[in-house]
């Protein structure tokens, strides 16, 4: 019985490349001369550092621009609160979303059931498994989800025949 998984996870290699490119541009830009502006990457989160709120917004703009060029959807990013650190400097933690949330998974399963396509959707942890008897039905579900589910960047993997 053919099946596939609907997941929501960023390509971490491309995220790392985008962070490195953003840091390179920030270090060479004239308006950041003498500034301690940078973006650091840890497990599943990014931290943007800058001298003030205005420069922090510019750092985030550079990061978003580089992510868009690397084909990383910016809907993966979840911005935390801006925190003041030593002196006037500020930082902001940016979490990279991973996995399909419970509400989104329920909505995806509901969309699959309402579409009247002969497939079954089941929630399995942070993914939604879709299985059916025909490969064409699964491809129709993928097309329908790409068109209708816009809240999160969905990815389809683990396609089995």
UniProtKB/Swiss-Prot annotation:
GO cellular component, one term: cytosol
Keywords (A to Z) from UniProt: Nucleotide-binding
Coiled-coil stretches noted in the UniProt entry, renumbered to this chain: none
Record Pfam families: DUF520
Domain of life of the source: Bacteria
GO function term, MF aspect, one: nucleotide binding
Keyword Amino-acid biosynthesis on entry: no
KW Nucleotide-binding (keyword) present: yes
Function per UniProt: Nucleotide-binding protein.
Family statement drawn from the similarity comment of this UniProt entry: Belongs to the YajQ family.
HAMAP family xrefs: YajQ
Protein name: Nucleotide-binding protein Rmet_2899
Source species of the chain: Cupriavidus metallidurans (strain ATCC 43123 / DSM 2839 / NBRC 102507 / CH34) (Ralstonia metallidurans)
């Amino acid at each position: 019985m053919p099946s596939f998984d609907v997941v929501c996870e960023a390509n971490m290699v491309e995220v790392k490349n985008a962070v490195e490119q953003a840091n390179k541009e920030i270090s060479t830009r004239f308006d950041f001369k003498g500034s301690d502006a940078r973006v650091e990457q840890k497990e599943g989160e990014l931290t943007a550092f800058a001298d003030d709120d205005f420069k922090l917004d510019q750092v985030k703009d550079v990061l978003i621009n580089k992510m868009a060029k690397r084909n990383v959807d910016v809907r993966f990013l979840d911005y935390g609160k801006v925190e003041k650190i030593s002196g006037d400097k500020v930082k902001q933690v940016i979490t990279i979303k991973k996995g399909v949330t419970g509400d989104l998974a329920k909505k995806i399963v509901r969309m699959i059931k309402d579409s009247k396509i002969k497939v079954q959707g089941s929630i399995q942890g942070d993914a939604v498994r879709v299985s059916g008897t025909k490969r064409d039905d699964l491809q129709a579900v993928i097309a329908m989800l790409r068109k209708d589910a816009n809240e999160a960047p969905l990815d389809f993997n683990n396609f089995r025949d």
